[in-house]
């Protein structure tokens, strides 16, 4: 069980950065970072980004220096590497989620890509207006964001069609909606009750700003606090506060 760090060589925000990883567990990595005074906001899903001025202190605290390529190799070998695309950030990772078969993982990934991964199976619509979000009733008496499953067809066109359908049913005419991010299930050994493709299936969230009176059917508007009370335990929920905390990253307007 070792903490590894590569040389500060990655430019961002006017300085150079190193990557800090564990080859055994995220718990070990978080514990080391906390002891060293590295804030949790520096965690990027499978590593910490640390500024160059902290490099020497982290090595002195026990992190072992290694070249960048070797660090990536060790992270891959540990099984802790979380794949993501450019302009994506891992918000949360569940290494053994109780709602999935044993040996699975669920990652919540914020994205600035134009479209979700090809293995997307469900789209959800984050329709928002004046700090409120639109929700619809679920069969169990709760509420959810409006959603559509893609069915047998997948890929970009199927995502567009599902997004068109969910908008038509809830907010009227379809319009531009921006990808906020997605939850990715990684299930190497699905059991007979697992309903989604394996080994990977993605559940995407798209955002669209609408007028406050843009509501069809049985949807209702909830404030962000009310929505958090009802939906805060849903696996995709971290994408919602991430969206509202960085609204300039998303282009769609009413």
Provide a role label for each language-model segment.
Residues 23-43:
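A short, structured beta-strand/loop element
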Residues 94, 139-143, 209-254:
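Nudix hydrolase/Nudix homology domain
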């Amino acid at each position: 069980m070792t903490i590894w760090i590569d040389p500060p060589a990655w430019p961002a925000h006017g300085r150079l950065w190193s990557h800090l990883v564990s080859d055994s567990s995220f718990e070990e990595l978080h514990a080391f970072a906390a002891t060293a005074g590295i804030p949790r906001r520096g965690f990027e899903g499978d590593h910490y980004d640390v500024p160059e001025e902290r490099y020497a202190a982290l090595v002195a605290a026990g992190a072992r220096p290694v070249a960048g390529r070797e660090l990536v190799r060790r992270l891959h070998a540990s099984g802790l590497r979380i794949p993501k695309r450019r302009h994506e950030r891992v918000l949360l990772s569940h290494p053994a989620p109780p709602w999935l078969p044993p040996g699975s993982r669920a990652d919540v990934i914020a994205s600035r890509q134009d479209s979700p991964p090809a293995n997307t199976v469900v789209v959800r619509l984050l329709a928002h207006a004046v700090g409120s979000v639109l929700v619809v009733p679920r069969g169990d008496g709760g509420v959810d964001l409006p959603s559509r499953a893609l069915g047998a067809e997948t890929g970009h066109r199927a995502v567009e069609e599902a997004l068109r359908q969910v908008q038509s049913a809830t907010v009227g005419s379809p319009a531009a909606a921006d990808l906020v991010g997605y939850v990715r299930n990684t299930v190497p050994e699905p059991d007979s009750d697992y309903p989604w493709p394996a080994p990977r299936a993605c559940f995407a969230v798209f955002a669209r700003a609408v007028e406050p009176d843009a509501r069809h059917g049985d949807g209702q508007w909830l404030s962000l606090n009310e929505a958090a009370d009802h939906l805060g335990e849903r696996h995709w929920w971290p994408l919602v506060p991430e969206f509202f905390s960085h609204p300039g990253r998303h282009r769609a307007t009413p």
